[in-house]
Regions:
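Helix-interface capping motifs at the ends of transmembrane segments in multi-pass membrane proteins
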Residues: 1-4, 128-130
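Small-residue-rich helix-interface/hinge motifs
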Residues: 3-85
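A broad, low-specificity signal for short, low-complexity segments enriched in glycine/proline
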Residues: 17-21, 100-105
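General alpha-helical segment detector with a strong preference for membrane-spanning helices
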Residues: 23-24, 116, 120
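A short acidic, glycine/proline-enriched capping/turn motif at secondary-structure boundaries
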Residues: 74-75, 113-116
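PDZ peptide-recognition modules
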Residues: 80-104, 111, 118-142
Length: 142
């Protein structure tokens, strides 16, 4: 049984990390504050803070993950913009996901699935390069 569970968990963790890192990379590129980068859900098992203030954590249930943006209160990143403008000062408002232009928010949201697509292409390329393609040599029957 462990012969299947451990590789499954490793595979899920890698896929989730690549997916969430896609969101994280473009969020940072566009100046969105990231407070949490989590692999898994539930209670935190292990974690650390980087120099930009992001909490990187590994959690108990490794069946997903999330990137939490600065100022987000709910999972849908929906907030009252007027309330956010009043709540945060000018420097903090520059880090808010919800106040970024639509094209930047779209890229950040799409970056996770696109990262997974690129991962799939890379895996197939490696399989094709190292395993090769099957062929049947021509045989002449008498």
């Amino acid at each position: 049984m462990l012969n299947f569970i451990i590789p499954f968990i490793i595979l899920i963790v890698v896929v989730v990390f690549i997916h969430e890192y896609g969101h994280y990379y473009f969020a940072k590129k566009y100046g969105v504050g990231v407070t949490d980068f989590s692999i898994g859900f539930g209670k935190e098992i292990f974690g650390w803070n980087d120099k930009s203030g992001t909490r990187w954590k590994i959690c108990l249930i490794p069946l997903g993950g999330y990137v939490k943006f600065f100022g987000d209160r709910n999972v849908f990143s929906q907030s009252d913009q007027e309330a956010l403008i009043k709540k945060y000062n000018e420097k903090e408002r520059e880090k808010l996901f919800i106040l970024k232009p639509l094209y930047q928010r779209s890229i950040i949201v799409a970056a996770g699935p696109i990262a997974n697509f690129i991962l799939a292409v890379v895996i197939f390329l490696f399989i094709y390069m190292f395993v090769g393609k099957d062929f049947t040599p021509a045989v002449i029957n008498e």
